């Protein structure tokens, strides 16, 4: 009997050891399978079920969170809901008679300012300085400027007359040319070819006028390029309130690279457009057929003549407007000076 019990106990112990070994092997296999497991390859895997479980867990956590109490906001009146400004909060805290300086005192006290500064003396000083520039001095300065401009105009007119007399007395260097003839030399590209022309035409002919009008911009650019460049321009002016003229040096603008390029570009050969070439051809045809007088008589009531007349009229209106504006400005200045007295 004792042997049978011993064998039974040994058999039970062996079975328990085998079950323990089997459990350990199963756990190791499960760990290996978990490492090699891919959720995407599993046909029974449902991602939506996992998301629903996470939502349920978050809902359970949110149920345990404390809810805010909005009863005070719902029961508040309209005035309590309004946002109060800084001054209103300050009045509630310190009273209606308290100022902002109670919170933010300045670096300088008001008592020291009232003791050290004499407001009456400053006012009298400013009033005395404003009365120093009288309208009589202003009128005198304006009259001096007008006298200077008139004297400059008179000297320029005399110099022009003397130059005209001297040019009339001197003999002409080139006697071969008629004084009423003008030599036109033009070199231009037309239709892909370089064409050079030189002819003698009357100074008052339509072709000469058309040529001078077409080359006006080119000659003006050449003259500007040939002029000497200066860094400043001296201007002498009299300041109101003082009799001595003062020299003002106005600084000129430095020429840019584009201006230099344009000045060199003007030295190239003249290029006429189709419109300018047709204008020159028409002017030469008018001179050959002697149609200038007939065209001038028939075009008096034409569209171009009317446009020129309206343009001259508008220029005169602009001049009168500028003069009236300057006179009104002077009158207002004089009235302000008289009122200050």
Curated annotation (Swiss-Prot):
GO biological process, one term: chromatin organization
Any one annotated GO CC term: Swr1 complex
Biased composition (Polar residues): 69-78, 152-170
Keywords, alphabetical: Activator, Chromatin regulator, Nucleus, Transcription, Transcription regulation
Main location: nucleus
Transmembrane segments: none
Top-rank taxon, per record: Eukaryota
Pfam families according to UniProt: BCNT
Stretch list, region Disordered: 1-104, 125-180, 316-341
Limits of the BCNT-C domain: 252-331
Assembly: Component of the SWR1 chromatin remodeling complex.
Function of the protein: Component of the SWR1 complex which mediates the ATP-dependent exchange of histone H2A for the H2A variant HZT1 leading to transcriptional regulation of selected genes by chromatin remodeling. Involved in chromosome stability.
Protein name, UniProt field: SWR1-complex protein 5
Species name: Debaryomyces hansenii (strain ATCC 36239 / CBS 767 / BCRC 21394 / JCM 1990 / NBRC 0083 / IGC 2968)
Name of the gene: SWC5
């Amino acid at each position: 009997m004792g042997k049978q019990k011993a064998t039974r106990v040994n058999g039970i112990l062996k079975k328990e050891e085998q079950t323990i070994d089997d459990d350990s092997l199963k756990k190791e296999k499960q760990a290996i399978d978990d490492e090699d497991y891919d959720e995407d390859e599993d046909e029974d895997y449902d991602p939506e079920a996992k998301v629903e479980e996470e939502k349920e867990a978050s809902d359970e956590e949110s149920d345990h969170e404390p809810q805010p109490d909005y009863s005070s906001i719902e029961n508040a009146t309209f005035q309590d809901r309004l946002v109060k400004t800084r001054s209103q909060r300050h009045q509630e805290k310190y009273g209606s008679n308290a100022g902002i300086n109670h919170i933010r005192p300045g670096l300088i006290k008001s008592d020291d300012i009232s003791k050290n500064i004499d407001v009456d003396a400053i006012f009298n000083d400013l009033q005395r300085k404003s009365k120093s520039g009288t309208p009589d001095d202003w009128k005198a300065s304006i009259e001096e400027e007008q006298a200077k401009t008139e004297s400059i105009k008179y000297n320029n007119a005399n110099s022009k007359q003397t130059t005209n007399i001297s040019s009339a007395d001197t003999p002409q260097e080139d006697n071969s040319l008629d004084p009423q003839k003008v030599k036109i030399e033009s070199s231009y590209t037309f239709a892909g070819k370089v064409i050079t022309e030189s002819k003698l035409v009357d100074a008052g002919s339509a072709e000469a006028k058309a040529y001078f009008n077409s080359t006006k911009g080119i000659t003006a650019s050449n003259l500007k390029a040939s002029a000497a460049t200066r860094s400043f321009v001296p201007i002498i002016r009299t300041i109101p309130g003082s009799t001595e003229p003062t020299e003002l040096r106005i600084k000129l603008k430095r020429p840019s690279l584009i201006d230099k390029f344009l000045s060199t570009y003007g030295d190239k050969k003249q290029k006429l457009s189709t419109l300018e070439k047709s204008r020159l051809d028409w002017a030469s045809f008018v001179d050959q057929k002697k149609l200038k007088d007939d065209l001038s008589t028939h075009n008096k009531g034409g569209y171009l003549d009317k446009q020129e007349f309206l343009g001259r009229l508008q220029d005169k209106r602009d001049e009168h407007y500028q003069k009236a504006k300057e006179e009104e400005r002077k009158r207002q200045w004089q009235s302000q000076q008289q009122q200050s007295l």
